[in-house]
Amino acid sequence: MEQTYQYAWIIPFIPLPVPILIGVGLLLFPTTTKNLRRIWAFPSILLLSIVMIFSINLSIQQIKRSPIYQYVWSWTINNDFSFEFGYLIDPLTSIMSMLITTVGIMVLVYSDNYMAHDQGYLRFFASMSFFSTSMLGLVTSSNLIQIYIFWELVGMCSYLLIGFWFTRPLAANACQKAFVTNRVGDFCLLLGILGFYWITGSFEFRDFFEILKNLIYNNEVNSSFLTLCASLLFTGAVAKSAQFPLHVWLPDAMEGPTPISALIHAATMVAAGIFLVARLLPLFIVIPYIMNFISLIGIITILLGATLALAQKDIKRGLAYSTMSQLGYMMLALGMGSYRSALFHLITHAYSKALLFLGSGSIIHSMETLVGYSPDKSQNMVLMGGLRKHIPSSQISFLLGTLSLCGIPPLACFWSKDEILNDSGFYSPIFAIIVWTAAGLTLFRHFCGNLLTFEGHLNVHFQNYSGNKNTPFYSISLWGKEGSKRINKNYRLFKMKNSQSSSFFSKKTYRSYENLKNGLRPFLNIVHFENKKSYSYPYESDNTMLFPLLVLGSFTLFIGSLGIPFNQELDVLTKWLTPSINLLHQKLNNSIDWYKFFEDSIFSVSIAYFGIFLASFLYKPIYSSFQNFDLTNSFLKIGPKRSISDKIINGLYNWSYNRAYIDTFYTTSLIETLRGLSLLARFFDRRAIDGITNGVGVLSFFLAEGIKYVGGGRISSYLFFYLSCLSIFLLGLYFSFSIVSIVIV
């Protein structure tokens, strides 16, 4: 066991050879590396699988013996300052490592086919492997400086991946928005780290917590300054985990490829903020008011995310706001001191949300066969509908993830979310009301999206918003820009024999132009079953994309059993978290009897089924899902005949669709203000600073011209004039000194 922990430092660096070798290959052998680009999926998955096996071994050791292992190397040592690097292996580290590796492997397998058509295939896998390295380095860090270094690397990787299709203006703006918003949080995090180092003189977590606890107990530190530093640390987590008010980057981050969205939302970037708060929870618990502040931010984020998701037509943006809301649940749980519940929900949400995002990628793939590479069309739920008949495997996986996030038993999120809902009732009745309301809205929104996508008819064949006949076939470039040429509507995109049928591992029927042109095939092939019956409709995804959905669906079904609370022997999660819970001085007895458990869960399940019923009633399939999406036709009414209730509903709809006008507020108050200040600075620079410089030059020019016209062009005259002036100056200077000496005498 000691050797397992001793070599744990290598965990973050195992995936690192992939981006290094890809970079060297592109530098030295660019043609060969590009021609053999598909082979890089295999080493990426293999190396991350090695990390997963290592993480599983560490997790088993911790569940059996519950140790916390820390190893430190001294970097610089003197009397006044010491800086150390090291790694810390505890339950939080092993949980995060398991999430990063398992979700990361599934995303890489999925991406091999999803990104096969893309010119940036090599860049994608290099960035993904470096992303995994950065996140693994973050969760194994033993001090705040290491965390900050890897924190910045995680932000850099997310910037590169969100803006992966950088030739699209929306993607370029989205990555800039994510970068700038996170710079605010990162700067606050750095200030908080420096502030606590000034207080404690240490960056190491264990020394840091112990010193601070003694200082607070002996009343040797200013509580206001302590609260300020803790708030600055928390602000870093707020930005990274998309909590209010620094959440604005998350929906726009959907401009990146769908596999990136799955990894960011499930196990990497947004999970980093939750990880930081969980890691620093022993610090926050002993500081007055900070726990209340954390729970307040969490509850606002829950409600805001649940309401803003209601009117989003983009399937990925709706999931993004859902992630924001679910992260709010975790933050609320940490603010209430429910450490176990927060991490439990982090685990269950990761697999459910990864399943939803990869399922949405399969849906988008099927829509792209009709509308081309245009996110405005392929991700628009208004143009979907009736896909259940065409992509049944993707529909089952998407429904499974939806039901899990809705809290339907016995799926994963039911067990974790129910704990947080019950804990909120003990913490604050007001918080409980808000949480239950937001839970109902979340259930309603998710099931509405499911109905819009899979039920009814394929709306892309019907009328568009303005009432004109929609022509779905366009020539779209690789980067999502719509071309001017329309494809013949009679062109059959798909041909399948009537003797084929659909199965979960159905053979891929959609292949992009690049694949056909270059003859490329997925490097990873999953054995498929032959189908006899065939149809002419949007194709089901390839087996390589369906296999991760199957695995994540299995996790969604069974991962909740990890923390079932009514049997202490079967409660693996509590055994796993025992060292961390002891560090927080919390009670270990989290088990309750069956009767109490079912009594607490009746209300949450009732709300879930009510939300499903309401969504089914309001979003029943009709000719156009656009009318359904606005809930009622009264949303579109104009004029004095509209009732007050219609105006209120329409106002709420606009508020949700326009993201509560928070982006507009930031644009007006910050961006426009900074732009005005920059214009003022430019005016001052050109008119004042440059004006003085240019004015001196112009004055010298005219003075020289005047002197030039005084002279006659003879050097002797110039020399006489110069000596005369010098004589007059010296004579005046002599008389001045004479007068001064007489006055003194």
Curated annotation (Swiss-Prot):
Belongs to the complex I subunit 5 family. The chain crosses the membrane at residues 9-29, 39-59, 89-109, 125-145, 147-167, 185-205, 230-250, 258-278, 283-303, 318-338, 396-416, 424-444, 546-566, 602-622, 725-745. InterPro entries: NADH_UbQ_OxRdtase_chlpt_su5_C, NADHpl_OxRdtase_5_subgr, ND/Mrp_TM, NU5C-like, Proton_antipo_N. Its EC number is 7.1.1.-. NDH shuttles electrons from NAD(P)H:plastoquinone, via FMN and iron-sulfur (Fe-S) centers, to quinones in the photosynthetic chain and possibly in a chloroplast respiratory chain. The immediate electron acceptor for the enzyme in this species is believed to be plastoquinone. Couples the redox reaction to proton translocation, and thus conserves the redox energy in a proton gradient. It is found in: Plastid, Chloroplast thylakoid membrane. It is a multi-pass membrane protein. The keyword Ubl conjugation does not apply. One of its GO terms (cellular component) is chloroplast thylakoid membrane. NCBIfam families: NDH_I_L, PRK06590.1. Keywords: Chloroplast, Membrane, NAD, NADP, Plastid, Plastoquinone, Quinone, Thylakoid, Translocase, Transmembrane, Transmembrane helix, Transport. The keyword Ligase does not apply. GO terms for biological process: ATP synthesis coupled electron transport; electron transport coupled proton transport. GO terms for molecular function: NADH dehydrogenase (ubiquinone) activity; quinone binding. It comes from Jasminum nudiflorum (Winter jasmine). NDH is composed of at least 16 different subunits, 5 of which are encoded in the nucleus. It comes from the Eukaryota. This is NAD(P)H-quinone oxidoreductase subunit 5, chloroplastic. It catalyses: a plastoquinone + NADH + (n+1) H(+)(in) = a plastoquinol + NAD(+) + n H(+)(out); a plastoquinone + NADPH + (n+1) H(+)(in) = a plastoquinol + NADP(+) + n H(+)(out). Pfam families: Proton_antipo_C, Proton_antipo_M, Proton_antipo_N.
